[in-house]
Curated annotation (Swiss-Prot):
Residues given in the record as Mg(2+) 3 binding sites: N684, R687, E692
The record's note on its domains: The Asp-Asp-Xaa-Xaa-Asp/Glu (DDXXD/E) motif is important for the catalytic activity, presumably through binding to Mg(2+).
Family: Belongs to the terpene synthase family.
Cofactor remark from the record: Binds 3 Mg(2+) ions per subunit.
Entry EC no(s): 4.2.3.19
Binding-site positions, Mg(2+) 2: D540, D544
Protein's name according to its UniProt entry: Ent-kaurene synthase TSP4, chloroplastic
Keyword set includes Amino-acid biosynthesis: no
InterPro entries: Isoprenoid_synthase_dom_sf, Terpene_cyclase_plant_C1, Terpene_synth_N, Terpene_synth_N_sf, Terpene_synthase-like, Terpene_synthase_metal-bd, Terpenoid_cyclase/PrenylTrfase
Keyword field: Chloroplast, Lyase, Magnesium, Membrane, Metal-binding, Plastid, Transmembrane, Transmembrane helix
Keyword Translocase part of the UniProt annotation: no
Length: 789
């Protein structure tokens, strides 16, 4: 981890970087440039990737003048009259701002309390050792002229400000530092400190921890046992240089000194606000890249970070397990990427957080949101504690949203909208490209975070991330628009638009592919997914509305025979159009897949379609005979008739990895398909219950009531179906993420999860393709480029 003084330096390591960013931003607004401009843009693109790759390997963090000042106050263990770290004093003398303060240049205007605290700490350090009188006077002048900010409610209060700042003013008096402050405001500050101390002195573990964290504001009120019980293996208290320095000043301790020396050995003559923070910073980078849709460019670098994080997880590293945001992020990112991590540490941490207002600063809504997102990743039936905590965190977020004031440790972040979306659309109903676009459009340039003082890091976010993600999104989208035009031509060429009974859902079918399989190299998989989506819609409508029993049987017979003369063997024009489109499309996908797989796959695709046709025919016969199946009979047929097989299964052959005959006949393959399809069928049945009852169709809700003797309500039946969906969805995700005993390649398994997310989104509000919200996201993913303003 390296230090930077100014957050502006994070983005200006190369002057050409700004020129590149500015140039390409303009090009996104005005269209494709000439060849020369394209070359420049390409060079800039590659340079940006290199900078991000470098950033993944390291962690950069801003200097904390506040923490450096407290370290500078530490006396030598050999003489209380000499500083232990004179280099820190020299750094303070060299880094005062022109206005007399000690603050990062270009700091946020709402951080005046932070600047006051940092400046006062620096003045105290210089005064304590009797150096820099002129610097002290300028600092005092700044404090006196900006003192009113300490009482302004609109200003952001760093953690512990009401305790620490008044205590430092007391210390200033002890050092005979003459501060001419407005008496009424000073008394108000002292009164607030008294109230804060009284509120926290109830001897509970969480309050004790909080007061230990703000040790520099406790002075003689500190208790040795209460403070030092929080010392970590590295010698620090809470990985905070300022807390550790204050604790050492009050209670000299060799391990505290070892920690401070190690920090200065790593960073030189100034320290950050938190150390170590490498794991969290690197995970933030990985999470940023994933959420912006550009992680595929850095797979090797990300793999290195994840492997190292997993090693630290298994070792019980305190940097992970003693910090709520880091633990939550590590759990979510590792589990999401298939690492075998138990939920025990996260549930234990959450238990402590719910019994503690301090642990991990859970009152910060960013921490709460991070914990909520982690708690969503429930994979196993025995993770009941995690499930309960997920509901508690959800309630906590809802309460925060309804309150007048939301405390956030991150500046410039549209946290209200982020929380609302997380509550409305859980991760299993949020499609990748929708997530990417939302994160790009609401991207937060201000990478400042706030604890006892503000700090910033390019790992939290920077312009390189935004530039690369916008360029990637728009370039992929241009490919997607062309593919959709190709799909529309295919519909006309195959005369599918002539089938008046059939819904025309071309854009929606393509959207479900583009929103999940968005990389340019997955074009064949997208087109297979979309074309088969259109065809399954047509066939479904043919069985429901457009075809007679004779026509349906004829269609099945044609697919069984395959090599037939359509001019003589088709019983109607509708059958001819449908079969011809099916055959043409299956052969095309089969040819492309066979080249990639180096074996023939066409017969397997035909079999997949026959399974669908047989299941649809069975439902037709049940309806004709007025047969009421058992629940088991219904599900065993309905998951196939839901028609996801022809959409997902052929596409597996086109995403890259080789799939052997053994793989596609393995139980894992079938389980993934059945779990995905059952979720989809039950989601459809819950949302479409009223409509399907009116149409005389079979539906899981009334069938479940009938199979239970009619003794349960429709609401109870729907609740049971939702529980079944949840169980199947979690099992599906577990199989997708499982690597150790898996037969199928992960990139193939992910298609089942992608489709599951599509279904959960499509059925989140309305019955299928009817939601206005869905129309908006289709436009956003396929038609509307992102324009940087």
């Amino acid at each position: 981890m390296s230090l930077q003084l100014s957050n502006s330096l994070f983005f200006a390591r190369k002057e050409s970087h700004f020129r590149c960013f500015s140039h390409v931003s303009a090009s996104l607004d005005t269209g494709v440039r000439r060849v020369t401009s394209a070359k420049i843009a390409s060079t800039c693109f590659e340079e940006t990737k290199e900078r991000i790759a470098d950033l993944i390997h390291k962690a950069e963090l801003s200097v904390s003048t506040y923490d450096t000042a407290w370290v500078a106050m530490v006396p030598s263990p050999n003489s209380s009259q000499e500083p232990c770290f004179p280099d820190c004093l020299s750094w303070l003398l060299q880094n005062q701002c022109c206005d007399g303060s000690w603050a990062c240049p270009h700091h946020h205007p709402l951080l005046k309390k932070d600047v006051l605290c940092s400046t006062l700490a620096c003045v105290l350090a210089l005064k304590k050792w009797g150096v820099g009188e002129e610097k002290i006077n300028r600092g005092v002048h700044f404090i006196e002229h900006n003192f009113a900010s300490a009482m302004e409610k609109c200003q952001i209060s760093p953690m512990g400000f009401d305790i620490i700042f008044p205590a430092m003013l007391d210390y200033a008096r002890d050092l005979l530092l003459n501060l001419r402050l407005e008496p009424t405001m000073l008394n108000d500050l002292i009164y607030k400190r008294g109230l804060e101390l009284k509120r926290n002195q109830n001897h509970s573990a969480e309050r004790e921890a909080y007061l230990a964290y703000v040790a520099e504001g406790m002075g003689k009120l500190q208790d040795l046992g209460s403070v030092m019980k929080h010392q970590r293996r590295n010698g620090s208290l809470f990985n905070s240089p300022s807390t550790t320095a204050a604790a050492f000043i009050a209670f000299p301790n060799s391990r505290c000194l070892t920690y401070l020396r190690s920090a200065l050995k790593k960073f030189g003559s100034a320290v950050p606000a938190v150390y170590p923070l490498d794991i969290y910073l690197q995970l933030c980078t990985v999470d940023n890249l994933e959420r912006l849709g550009i992680s595929r460019y850095f797979q090797k670098e990300i793999q290195g970070v994840l492997d190292e994080t997993y090693r630290c997880w298994l070792q019980g590293n305190e940097e992970i397990f003693m910090d709520a945001p880091t633990c939550a992020l590590a759990f979510r990112v590792l589990r999401k990427n298939g690492y075998n991590v138990t939920s025990d540490p996260i549930t234990k941490l959450l238990e402590e957080c719910f019994s503690s207002s301090f642990c991990g600063n859970i009152k910060d809504i960013n921490t709460t949101l991070g914990l909520y997102r982690a708690s969503e990743f429930i994979l196993y039936p025995d993770e009941r504690d995690l499930e309960k905590q997920n509901l508690m965190l959800k309630n906590l977020l809802e309460q925060e949203l309804s309150s007048d004031f939301i405390h956030s440790s991150q500046l410039g972040r549209n946290i209200d909208a982020e929380v609302k979306h997380a509550l409305e659309y859980p991760f299993y109903a949020d499609l990748d490209r929708i997530v990417n676009r939302r994160n790009i459009e609401h991207y937060n340039f201000d990478n400042t975070r706030i604890l006892k003082t503000s700090y910033c890091s390019p790992n939290f976010g920077n312009k390189d991330f935004l530039f690369l993600s916008v360029k990637d999104y728009n370039e992929c989208q241009a490919i997607h628009r062309e593919e959709l035009r190709e799909l529309e031509r295919w519909v006309i060429e195959n005369r599918l638009d002539e089938l008046r009974f059939a819904r025309q859902k071309c854009a929606y079918c393509y959207f479900s592919a583009a929103a999940t399989l968005f990389a340019p190299e997955l074009s064949n998989a997208r087109m297979s997914w979309a074309k088969n989506g259109v065809l399954t819609t047509v066939v479904d409508d043919f069985f429901d509305l457009g075809g007679s029993v004779e026509e349906l049987k004829n269609l099945i017979q044609l697919v069984e025979l395959w090599d037939v003369d359509v001019s003589t063997e088709c019983s109607s024009q509708n059958v001819q159009i449908i079969f011809s489109a099916l055959k043409c499309t299956i052969c095309d996908i089969g040819d492309k897949g066979s080249k990639l797989q180096e074996r023939s796959i066409t017969n397997h695709i035909i079999d997949i379609w026959l399974d669908l046709l047989y299941s649809m025919m069975k439902e037709t016969e049940w309806a004709r005979d007025k047969y009421i199946p058992t629940m088991d009979e219904y599900i065993s047929n309905a998951y196939v008739s839901f028609a996801l097989g022809p959409i997902v299964l052929p596409a597996l052959y086109l995403v890259g990895p080789k799939l052997s005959e053994e793989m596609v006949h393995h139980s894992e393959y079938h389980n993934l398909y059945k779990l995905m399809s059952t979720c989809g069928r039950l989601l459809n049945d819950i949302r479409g219950c009223e409509r399907e009852l009116k149409e005389g169709k079979l539906n899981a809700i009334p069938l479940y009531i009938i199979n239970n003797g009619g003794e349960i309500t429709k609401e109870a039946a729907a609740s049971e179906m939702k529980s079944l969906i949840e169980t199947h969805r979690r099992e599906l995700l577990r199989l997708v993420l499982e690597g150790k005993n898996s037969v199928l390649p992960k990139s193939c398994k992910e298609l089942f999860w992608h489709m599951s997310k599509v279904l959960h989104l499509f059925y989140s509000k309305d019955d299928g393709f009817t939601s206005q919200d869905l129309i908006k996201v289709v436009k956003a993913v396929i038609y509307e480029p992102i324009v940087l303003k």
